[in-house]
Amino acid sequence: MARYGLIGLGFGVAVSLVTVPMLAWSEVSAFERFQQQRQQAFEQHQSDFQEAFQEFQDAFHEEFAAYQEELRANWREPRISDRHRWVEYSDDQSSRTVVDYEENSITIDVPSEAGTQGVLSHLNDLLGRTMDEAYDRDEVTQRTQQRVGLGEDAPEAASDQRVLSEIKPEDLDEMISQAELEEREEPKGEESRSVISLTVPMPEQRPSRKVEEFREQIRRHAERYEVEEALMIAIMHSESSFNPMARSHIPAFGLMQIVPQTAGKDVAQRVYGEMKLLSPEYLYNPENNIQAGAVYLNILFYSYLSAIEDPESRMYAVIAAYNTGAGNVARAFVDGRNIRAAARVINDLTPHEVYERLLADLPYDETRNYLVHVASRTEAYRNF
Protein backbone atom coordinates (compact mmCIF):
# COMPACT_ATOMS: atom_id res chain seq x y z
CA MET A 1 0.00 0.00 0.00
CA ALA A 2 2.74 2.39 0.98
CA ARG A 3 4.69 1.49 -2.13
CA TYR A 4 1.66 2.10 -4.35
CA GLY A 5 1.18 5.49 -2.72
CA LEU A 6 4.79 6.35 -3.29
CA ILE A 7 4.53 5.46 -6.95
CA GLY A 8 1.39 7.60 -7.24
CA LEU A 9 3.15 10.53 -5.57
CA GLY A 10 6.10 10.23 -7.90
CA PHE A 11 3.79 10.22 -10.91
CA GLY A 12 2.09 13.35 -9.64
CA VAL A 13 5.43 15.12 -9.25
CA ALA A 14 6.46 14.07 -12.73
CA VAL A 15 3.23 15.42 -14.18
CA SER A 16 3.66 18.74 -12.42
CA LEU A 17 7.25 19.04 -13.65
CA VAL A 18 6.09 18.49 -17.18
CA THR A 19 3.08 20.83 -16.83
CA VAL A 20 5.00 23.89 -15.59
CA PRO A 21 7.10 24.40 -18.74
CA MET A 22 4.11 23.57 -20.90
CA LEU A 23 2.07 26.29 -19.17
CA ALA A 24 4.96 28.75 -19.49
CA TRP A 25 5.30 27.94 -23.19
CA SER A 26 1.55 28.35 -23.61
CA GLU A 27 1.64 31.78 -21.96
CA VAL A 28 4.56 32.92 -24.14
CA SER A 29 2.78 31.67 -27.22
CA ALA A 30 -0.40 33.54 -26.26
CA PHE A 31 1.61 36.72 -25.63
CA GLU A 32 3.33 36.41 -29.01
CA ARG A 33 -0.05 35.94 -30.69
CA PHE A 34 -1.32 39.03 -28.87
CA GLN A 35 1.71 41.04 -30.00
CA GLN A 36 1.28 39.80 -33.55
CA GLN A 37 -2.41 40.72 -33.53
CA ARG A 38 -1.60 44.19 -32.20
CA GLN A 39 1.01 44.70 -34.91
CA GLN A 40 -1.40 43.53 -37.60
CA ALA A 41 -4.10 45.86 -36.26
CA PHE A 42 -1.64 48.77 -36.24
CA GLU A 43 -0.52 48.05 -39.80
CA GLN A 44 -4.14 47.79 -40.93
CA HIS A 45 -4.91 51.12 -39.26
CA GLN A 46 -1.89 52.68 -40.97
CA SER A 47 -3.04 51.31 -44.30
CA ASP A 48 -6.62 52.54 -43.77
CA PHE A 49 -5.27 55.95 -42.76
CA GLN A 50 -3.10 56.30 -45.88
CA GLU A 51 -5.93 55.05 -48.08
CA ALA A 52 -8.39 57.58 -46.60
CA PHE A 53 -6.05 60.50 -47.22
CA GLN A 54 -5.18 59.27 -50.71
CA GLU A 55 -8.89 59.13 -51.52
CA PHE A 56 -9.32 62.68 -50.22
CA GLN A 57 -6.25 63.92 -52.09
CA ASP A 58 -7.38 62.38 -55.39
CA ALA A 59 -10.88 63.85 -54.96
CA PHE A 60 -9.40 67.25 -54.06
CA HIS A 61 -7.27 67.38 -57.22
CA GLU A 62 -10.21 66.28 -59.37
CA GLU A 63 -12.55 68.89 -57.86
CA PHE A 64 -9.88 71.59 -58.18
CA ALA A 65 -9.45 70.85 -61.89
CA ALA A 66 -13.21 70.64 -62.49
CA TYR A 67 -13.89 73.93 -60.70
CA GLN A 68 -11.08 75.66 -62.56
CA GLU A 69 -12.60 74.50 -65.85
CA GLU A 70 -16.05 75.77 -64.80
CA LEU A 71 -14.60 79.20 -64.07
CA ARG A 72 -13.19 79.50 -67.59
CA ALA A 73 -16.72 80.18 -68.83
CA ASN A 74 -16.57 83.57 -67.04
CA TRP A 75 -12.88 84.28 -66.43
CA ARG A 76 -9.96 84.36 -68.81
CA GLU A 77 -7.58 83.54 -65.95
CA PRO A 78 -9.40 81.61 -63.21
CA ARG A 79 -7.88 82.16 -59.79
CA ILE A 80 -8.41 79.78 -56.88
CA SER A 81 -7.35 80.10 -53.24
CA ASP A 82 -3.80 79.05 -52.42
CA ARG A 83 -1.31 79.60 -49.60
CA HIS A 84 -1.03 83.35 -50.04
CA ARG A 85 -4.34 84.24 -51.73
CA TRP A 86 -7.90 83.90 -50.51
CA VAL A 87 -10.31 83.87 -53.47
CA GLU A 88 -14.12 83.84 -53.50
CA TYR A 89 -16.66 83.85 -56.34
CA SER A 90 -20.33 84.78 -56.30
CA ASP A 91 -22.83 81.94 -56.64
CA ASP A 92 -23.23 82.59 -60.38
CA GLN A 93 -19.43 83.03 -60.75
CA SER A 94 -19.86 86.47 -62.36
CA SER A 95 -18.09 88.35 -59.52
CA ARG A 96 -14.82 87.65 -57.77
CA THR A 97 -12.80 88.87 -54.78
CA VAL A 98 -9.08 88.18 -54.39
CA VAL A 99 -7.22 88.93 -51.17
CA ASP A 100 -3.51 88.77 -52.02
CA TYR A 101 -1.57 88.49 -48.77
CA GLU A 102 1.85 88.70 -50.44
CA GLU A 103 0.97 91.85 -52.40
CA ASN A 104 -1.08 93.13 -49.43
CA SER A 105 -4.02 94.05 -51.65
CA ILE A 106 -7.69 93.28 -52.34
CA THR A 107 -9.07 93.08 -55.89
CA ILE A 108 -12.81 92.99 -56.54
CA ASP A 109 -14.22 92.21 -59.99
CA VAL A 110 -17.94 92.69 -60.72
CA PRO A 111 -20.06 92.98 -63.90
CA SER A 112 -19.96 96.58 -65.18
CA GLU A 113 -23.72 96.99 -64.73
CA ALA A 114 -23.22 96.61 -60.95
CA GLY A 115 -21.22 99.85 -60.97
CA THR A 116 -18.93 101.16 -58.24
CA GLN A 117 -21.74 100.69 -55.73
CA GLY A 118 -21.67 96.97 -56.48
CA VAL A 119 -17.91 96.93 -55.95
CA LEU A 120 -18.19 98.66 -52.55
CA SER A 121 -20.99 96.30 -51.54
CA HIS A 122 -18.73 93.31 -52.27
CA LEU A 123 -15.91 94.96 -50.29
CA ASN A 124 -18.16 95.42 -47.26
CA ASP A 125 -19.33 91.81 -47.48
CA LEU A 126 -15.74 90.62 -47.70
CA LEU A 127 -14.59 92.60 -44.67
CA GLY A 128 -17.41 91.11 -42.60
CA ARG A 129 -16.82 87.50 -43.66
CA THR A 130 -16.10 85.06 -40.82
CA MET A 131 -13.89 82.01 -41.15
CA ASP A 132 -16.94 79.78 -40.77
CA GLU A 133 -18.59 81.56 -43.69
CA ALA A 134 -15.39 81.49 -45.75
CA TYR A 135 -15.10 77.74 -45.18
CA ASP A 136 -18.71 77.22 -46.27
CA ARG A 137 -17.98 79.21 -49.46
CA ASP A 138 -14.79 77.28 -50.27
CA GLU A 139 -16.10 75.39 -53.30
CA VAL A 140 -13.17 73.03 -53.83
CA THR A 141 -12.97 71.89 -50.21
CA GLN A 142 -16.75 71.65 -49.81
CA ARG A 143 -17.15 69.55 -52.96
CA THR A 144 -14.29 67.31 -51.89
CA GLN A 145 -15.67 66.88 -48.38
CA GLN A 146 -19.09 65.96 -49.79
CA ARG A 147 -17.43 63.16 -51.74
CA VAL A 148 -14.98 61.90 -49.13
CA GLY A 149 -15.51 63.54 -45.73
CA LEU A 150 -11.92 63.72 -44.45
CA GLY A 151 -11.58 63.65 -40.67
CA GLU A 152 -15.28 63.39 -39.91
CA ASP A 153 -14.48 61.93 -36.50
CA ALA A 154 -12.17 64.84 -35.63
CA PRO A 155 -13.42 67.86 -33.67
CA GLU A 156 -14.85 70.41 -36.11
CA ALA A 157 -14.57 74.12 -35.56
CA ALA A 158 -13.66 76.82 -38.05
CA SER A 159 -14.21 80.17 -36.30
CA ASP A 160 -16.68 83.02 -36.03
CA GLN A 161 -13.73 85.43 -36.13
CA ARG A 162 -13.54 87.68 -39.21
CA VAL A 163 -10.97 86.55 -41.76
CA LEU A 164 -9.79 90.15 -42.23
CA SER A 165 -10.24 91.20 -38.60
CA GLU A 166 -6.97 93.16 -38.77
CA ILE A 167 -8.64 95.71 -41.09
CA LYS A 168 -10.48 98.32 -39.03
CA PRO A 169 -13.45 100.50 -40.13
CA GLU A 170 -11.22 103.56 -39.87
CA ASP A 171 -8.87 102.05 -42.50
CA LEU A 172 -11.49 102.10 -45.26
CA ASP A 173 -11.28 105.75 -46.29
CA GLU A 174 -7.51 105.54 -46.71
CA MET A 175 -7.75 102.25 -48.61
CA ILE A 176 -10.41 103.56 -51.01
CA SER A 177 -8.51 106.82 -51.58
CA GLN A 178 -5.66 104.73 -53.05
CA ALA A 179 -7.93 102.46 -55.12
CA GLU A 180 -7.21 101.70 -58.76
CA LEU A 181 -10.24 101.18 -61.01
CA GLU A 182 -10.24 99.62 -64.46
CA GLU A 183 -12.70 98.14 -66.90
CA ARG A 184 -11.90 95.09 -69.01
CA GLU A 185 -13.46 92.30 -71.03
CA GLU A 186 -13.97 88.81 -69.66
CA PRO A 187 -15.61 85.79 -71.34
CA LYS A 188 -19.29 84.95 -71.02
CA GLY A 189 -19.66 81.55 -72.60
CA GLU A 190 -18.87 82.03 -76.29
CA GLU A 191 -19.26 85.81 -76.01
CA SER A 192 -17.69 88.49 -73.79
CA ARG A 193 -18.80 90.76 -70.98
CA SER A 194 -17.57 93.97 -69.37
CA VAL A 195 -16.14 93.84 -65.84
CA ILE A 196 -15.20 96.61 -63.40
CA SER A 197 -12.09 95.79 -61.35
CA LEU A 198 -11.16 97.67 -58.17
CA THR A 199 -7.82 97.08 -56.43
CA VAL A 200 -7.25 98.57 -52.98
CA PRO A 201 -4.13 98.27 -50.82
CA MET A 202 -4.51 96.82 -47.36
CA PRO A 203 -2.92 98.77 -44.47
CA GLU A 204 0.86 98.47 -44.29
CA GLN A 205 0.49 97.45 -40.65
CA ARG A 206 -1.75 94.50 -41.58
CA PRO A 207 0.88 91.74 -41.08
CA SER A 208 2.02 93.08 -37.70
CA ARG A 209 -1.60 93.53 -36.61
CA LYS A 210 -2.31 89.90 -37.50
CA VAL A 211 0.68 88.76 -35.46
CA GLU A 212 -0.57 90.76 -32.48
CA GLU A 213 -4.03 89.28 -32.96
CA PHE A 214 -2.63 85.75 -32.67
CA ARG A 215 0.10 86.63 -30.17
CA GLU A 216 -1.62 85.19 -27.11
CA GLN A 217 -2.24 81.81 -28.80
CA ILE A 218 1.29 81.73 -30.24
CA ARG A 219 2.87 82.52 -26.86
CA ARG A 220 0.71 80.02 -24.98
CA HIS A 221 1.44 77.12 -27.34
CA ALA A 222 5.12 78.06 -27.71
CA GLU A 223 5.54 77.85 -23.93
CA ARG A 224 3.52 74.66 -23.60
CA TYR A 225 5.40 72.80 -26.32
CA GLU A 226 8.82 74.38 -25.64
CA VAL A 227 9.41 75.97 -29.03
CA GLU A 228 10.54 79.48 -29.85
CA GLU A 229 7.79 82.04 -30.38
CA ALA A 230 9.78 83.90 -33.06
CA LEU A 231 10.25 80.67 -35.01
CA MET A 232 6.51 79.97 -34.97
CA ILE A 233 5.76 83.47 -36.30
CA ALA A 234 8.46 83.16 -38.98
CA ILE A 235 7.02 79.84 -40.16
CA MET A 236 3.50 81.29 -40.19
CA HIS A 237 4.75 84.26 -42.26
CA SER A 238 6.54 82.00 -44.74
CA GLU A 239 3.82 79.36 -45.01
CA SER A 240 0.76 81.59 -45.41
CA SER A 241 1.60 85.30 -45.08
CA PHE A 242 -0.81 85.11 -42.09
CA ASN A 243 -3.70 83.98 -44.30
CA PRO A 244 -5.99 81.89 -42.05
CA MET A 245 -7.75 80.45 -45.13
CA ALA A 246 -4.48 79.32 -46.74
CA ARG A 247 -4.61 76.08 -48.70
CA SER A 248 -1.91 74.44 -50.80
CA HIS A 249 -2.09 72.02 -53.74
CA ILE A 250 -1.11 69.04 -51.54
CA PRO A 251 -3.45 70.05 -49.76
CA ALA A 252 -2.22 71.62 -46.52
CA PHE A 253 -4.49 73.92 -44.54
CA GLY A 254 -4.38 77.07 -42.44
CA LEU A 255 -1.87 79.50 -41.00
CA MET A 256 0.93 76.96 -40.46
CA GLN A 257 0.01 74.74 -43.43
CA ILE A 258 -0.67 71.41 -41.76
CA VAL A 259 -0.92 68.39 -44.07
CA PRO A 260 -3.39 65.92 -42.48
CA GLN A 261 -1.45 62.88 -43.71
CA THR A 262 1.99 63.82 -42.32
CA ALA A 263 2.30 66.53 -39.67
CA GLY A 264 -1.42 66.22 -38.91
CA LYS A 265 -1.07 62.51 -38.17
CA ASP A 266 1.74 63.09 -35.65
CA VAL A 267 -0.13 66.00 -34.09
CA ALA A 268 -3.34 64.01 -33.64
CA GLN A 269 -1.38 61.17 -32.04
CA ARG A 270 0.18 63.60 -29.55
CA VAL A 271 -2.93 65.69 -28.83
CA TYR A 272 -5.67 63.04 -28.97
CA GLY A 273 -3.69 59.88 -28.27
CA GLU A 274 -4.64 58.24 -31.55
CA MET A 275 -3.87 58.44 -35.23
CA LYS A 276 -6.66 60.36 -36.94
CA LEU A 277 -7.10 62.64 -39.93
CA LEU A 278 -7.73 66.24 -38.94
CA SER A 279 -10.43 67.83 -41.12
CA PRO A 280 -9.99 71.02 -43.18
CA GLU A 281 -12.58 72.73 -40.98
CA TYR A 282 -10.56 71.84 -37.88
CA LEU A 283 -7.32 73.13 -39.42
CA TYR A 284 -8.88 76.41 -40.64
CA ASN A 285 -9.48 77.32 -36.99
CA PRO A 286 -6.50 79.53 -35.97
CA GLU A 287 -6.33 78.17 -32.42
CA ASN A 288 -6.24 74.57 -33.65
CA ASN A 289 -3.76 75.36 -36.40
CA ILE A 290 -1.35 77.24 -34.17
CA GLN A 291 -1.44 74.41 -31.65
CA ALA A 292 -0.84 71.87 -34.42
CA GLY A 293 2.16 73.83 -35.69
CA ALA A 294 3.63 74.08 -32.19
CA VAL A 295 3.10 70.36 -31.52
CA TYR A 296 4.76 69.40 -34.79
CA LEU A 297 7.75 71.65 -34.06
CA ASN A 298 8.02 70.00 -30.64
CA ILE A 299 8.04 66.56 -32.28
CA LEU A 300 10.76 67.64 -34.70
CA PHE A 301 12.88 69.28 -31.98
CA TYR A 302 12.56 66.68 -29.22
CA SER A 303 11.89 63.42 -31.07
CA TYR A 304 12.90 63.19 -34.72
CA LEU A 305 15.94 65.50 -34.54
CA SER A 306 16.76 65.28 -30.83
CA ALA A 307 20.18 63.68 -31.50
CA ILE A 308 21.46 67.00 -32.90
CA GLU A 309 23.26 68.54 -29.94
CA ASP A 310 23.75 72.21 -30.81
CA PRO A 311 20.47 74.17 -30.47
CA GLU A 312 21.19 76.43 -33.45
CA SER A 313 22.16 73.52 -35.69
CA ARG A 314 19.03 71.69 -34.62
CA MET A 315 16.90 74.76 -35.38
CA TYR A 316 18.20 74.89 -38.97
CA ALA A 317 17.45 71.18 -39.38
CA VAL A 318 13.97 71.62 -37.88
CA ILE A 319 13.15 74.51 -40.24
CA ALA A 320 14.12 72.39 -43.25
CA ALA A 321 12.26 69.36 -41.86
CA TYR A 322 9.07 71.38 -41.37
CA ASN A 323 9.08 71.89 -45.13
CA THR A 324 10.42 68.61 -46.47
CA GLY A 325 10.50 66.02 -43.65
CA ALA A 326 13.33 64.84 -41.40
CA GLY A 327 14.37 62.06 -43.81
CA ASN A 328 15.17 64.55 -46.56
CA VAL A 329 17.19 66.64 -44.10
CA ALA A 330 19.32 63.55 -43.38
CA ARG A 331 20.03 63.21 -47.11
CA ALA A 332 21.99 66.49 -47.00
CA PHE A 333 24.56 64.82 -44.71
CA VAL A 334 24.54 61.07 -45.40
CA ASP A 335 23.68 58.65 -48.17
CA GLY A 336 20.11 57.85 -47.16
CA ARG A 337 17.44 59.00 -44.74
CA ASN A 338 18.95 57.80 -41.45
CA ILE A 339 18.51 60.72 -39.06
CA ARG A 340 20.78 59.28 -36.34
CA ALA A 341 23.62 58.86 -38.82
CA ALA A 342 23.08 62.41 -40.09
CA ALA A 343 23.11 63.74 -36.51
CA ARG A 344 26.57 62.25 -35.95
CA VAL A 345 27.85 64.21 -38.95
CA ILE A 346 26.02 67.38 -37.89
CA ASN A 347 27.45 67.19 -34.37
CA ASP A 348 30.97 67.50 -35.82
CA LEU A 349 30.06 70.75 -37.64
CA THR A 350 29.52 74.33 -36.49
CA PRO A 351 26.00 75.79 -36.84
CA HIS A 352 27.21 77.92 -39.76
CA GLU A 353 28.62 74.84 -41.49
CA VAL A 354 25.32 73.01 -40.92
CA TYR A 355 23.40 75.92 -42.46
CA GLU A 356 25.70 76.05 -45.49
CA ARG A 357 25.57 72.28 -45.94
CA LEU A 358 21.77 72.36 -45.92
CA LEU A 359 21.73 75.16 -48.51
CA ALA A 360 24.12 73.21 -50.72
CA ASP A 361 22.80 69.66 -50.39
CA LEU A 362 19.09 69.66 -49.50
CA PRO A 363 17.27 67.73 -52.24
CA TYR A 364 14.87 70.53 -53.25
CA ASP A 365 15.30 74.20 -54.16
CA GLU A 366 12.01 75.01 -52.44
CA THR A 367 13.38 73.81 -49.09
CA ARG A 368 16.64 75.74 -49.53
CA ASN A 369 14.72 78.96 -50.16
CA TYR A 370 12.39 78.14 -47.28
CA LEU A 371 15.33 77.76 -44.89
CA VAL A 372 16.74 81.17 -45.90
CA HIS A 373 13.40 82.93 -45.44
CA VAL A 374 12.42 81.30 -42.15
CA ALA A 375 15.87 81.66 -40.57
CA SER A 376 16.08 85.37 -41.43
CA ARG A 377 12.50 86.02 -40.34
CA THR A 378 13.07 84.20 -37.05
CA GLU A 379 15.93 86.58 -36.31
CA ALA A 380 13.73 89.57 -37.19
CA TYR A 381 10.78 88.40 -35.07
CA ARG A 382 13.02 87.96 -32.02
CA ASN A 383 13.05 91.75 -31.90
CA PHE A 384 9.37 92.18 -32.75
Predicted segments with their positions:
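Non-membrane alpha-helical structural segments and their capping/turn regions in soluble enzymes
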Residues: 212, 287-291, 312, 316, ...
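Short, functionally critical alpha-helical segments immediately adjacent to catalytic or ligand/cofactor-binding
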Residues: 226-250, 257-259, 293-294, 318-323, ...
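Cell-wall glycan-active module
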Residues: 2-8, 12, 20-237, 302, ...
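Substrate-binding/active-site groove segments that recognize
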Residues: 249-276, 288-301, 346-349, 374
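Short pre-active-site segment immediately N-terminal to the catalytic Zn-binding motif
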Residues: 226, 278-281
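Secretory-pathway/luminal and periplasmic proteins that interact with or process carbohydrate-rich
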Residues: 240-249, 265, 300, 324-336
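Active-site metal-coordination segments of metallo-dependent hydrolases
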Residues: 206-209, 280-290, 365-366
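Active-site/pore-lining binding-face segments in mid-to-C-terminal subdomains
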Residues: 307-330
